[in-house]
């Protein structure tokens, strides 16, 4: 079992590493490529676009051909794209490399969640996804620090060679450690079960909405945090870094505590708690009379996301034993596109950073609480269905 957990964690971590590690080198990258930092900030959106594009096909391929045939090319593409970015001499080539990086990371991301659905029952999967969420929270803190240390001695290209090295490690794990987990193709008598695994299932769609709104909350916070903390609240760059590190610490602590909470409380209780914390955060930020109260509201955001996201993802994947790859892809596409659409629309309409965050917090909490309370599984979700794995 440990091999599946290690491989799943490694496959997922390419996604945040690809986002966060290069940011510290952005000024030098812009200077070398004769582009402005503003022009290269689109590299974030291009990377997410690559991930979304990968998710359009990766899940279906993973369900038909297996998890390894998607993970291995995905890791290989991430390696090639990282090297391509390091060799880019124009901003256009650099952005093309970032898109390819996103494609590779997206393939690996989809496979990771499909593997966890294949190998874990509902309760254990919720615990593992909460732990995975905690580990993922470490990356936005550690990746820029690692990038800074690398750039003390080496040029910005070394950041992408470091990413390529990470990709090589994931590729080796996928080749030699990961075993295929895709369930055997269903017999004719099992076709009704396959047909029941519909993406239009009300319970699944409700969890897609909940997780998409939750991701929109956390990405809105990350995206607006420089404006909120430095421009509006007046913190210095060093203080901003410290606050973000502390918020990551809150996320990690809560994420690592959630598996223990699942041994005491029902998953539904934790999901409700998550959304109540979002609502409390939105109200706190809306009426906050001081920076200290605002910072408390920000910690509520991190705690709320960490308590509920892993549980919601586990519930979303629960009904799918034969189509876990497609379900994982659908979740990923909805989360990436939904959150990006919200941030883009808010910017186009001219909603300020503060109101953007408050708005998504309150909307997410109200909609999600209604879905949690009124949309329940239409049939009992099997704790775990024994599967015959392909060699």
From Swiss-Prot:
Keyword match DNA damage: no
Membrane spanning stretches: 4-24, 42-62, 69-89, 93-113, 131-151, 158-178, 203-222, 245-265, 269-289, 293-313, 324-346, 363-383
Record GO biological process: response to antibiotic
Signal sequence, start to end: none
Gene Ontology CC entries for this record: plasma membrane
GO molecular function annotation: transmembrane transporter activity
Keywords in alphabetical order: Antibiotic resistance, Cell inner membrane, Cell membrane, Membrane, Transmembrane, Transmembrane helix, Transport
Membrane topology: Multi-pass membrane protein
Location in or out of the cell: Cell inner membrane
PROSITE patterns: MFS (PS50850)
Chain's role: Confers resistance to chloramphenicol.
Family classification: Belongs to the major facilitator superfamily. DHA1 family. MdtL (TC 2.A.1.2.22) subfamily.
Name of this chain's protein: Multidrug resistance protein MdtL
Organism expressing this protein natively: Escherichia fergusonii (strain ATCC 35469 / DSM 13698 / CCUG 18766 / IAM 14443 / JCM 21226 / LMG 7866 / NBRC 102419 / NCTC 12128 / CDC 0568-73)
